[in-house]
A protein has these predicted regions:
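Conserved beta-strand-loop-beta-strand hairpin that lines the nucleotide-binding pocket
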Residues: 1-4, 50-135
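Short amphipathic alpha-helical interaction patches enriched in hydrophobic/aromatic residues
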Residues: 5, 25-29, 53
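A short beta-loop-alpha structural element at the N-terminal edge
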Residues: 6-17
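Structural signature of the histidine kinase catalytic ATP-binding subdomain
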Residues: 9, 30-33, 57, 68
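Conserved short strand/loop->alpha-helix "switch" segment adjacent to the catalytic nucleotide/phosphoryl-transfer site
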Residues: 21-43, 98-99
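Conserved polar catalytic motif of the HATPase_c/GHKL fold
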Residues: 44, 48
Length: 135
């Protein structure tokens, strides 16, 4: 099922995206691990768009496109912020960064999803989770 959302940069608005997308995931019969991976990645990407992208400016929007089928879930999230260079984000697993509070969301997303691409100068993330159990 394809869906489109535009939400304000407000953490309370995340449920407007999360609930229907996760309902589509359930309807498409993803296993428990894949469902967890999609949920965590979607939440992290939305929080990152609001916090780091739009810097919690409620006048700026976050746009989301989702396409969930039994074979794959694709979610695209775009903010109105200045973007970032993914290559310049420090590795949160490196010893010197273990106590730093940032960078883990990106690591989670890239670990849990099958494919992740950062587009439009880091203002947009495209996440794909393949359903390995699809018939």
């Amino acid at each position: 099922m394809k869906r489109s959302f535009t939400i304000p940069s407000d953490y309370d608005a995340i449920r407007q995206v999360l609930d229907p997308v996760m309902s589509d995931v359930a309807d498409s019969r993803y296993d428990t691990d894949s469902t967890f991976a999609i949920r965590i990645s979607l939440e992290e990407a939305l929080v990152n768009a609001i916090k780091h992208g739009n810097r919690e400016d409620r006048r700026k929007a976050v746009r989301v496109e989702s396409d969930v089928t039994p074979a794959r879930a694709e979610i695209v999230i775009e903010d109105e912020g200045p973007g970032f260079d993914r290559k310049r984000v420090p590795d949160p697993t490196a010893a010197e960064n273990l106590c730093r509070p940032s960078g883990r969301g990106i690591l989670l997303i890239e670990s849990y999803m099958s494919d992740v691409t950062w587009e439009r100068g880091g203002r947009r993330v495209r996440m794909v989770k393949r359903n390995e159990n699809a018939a």
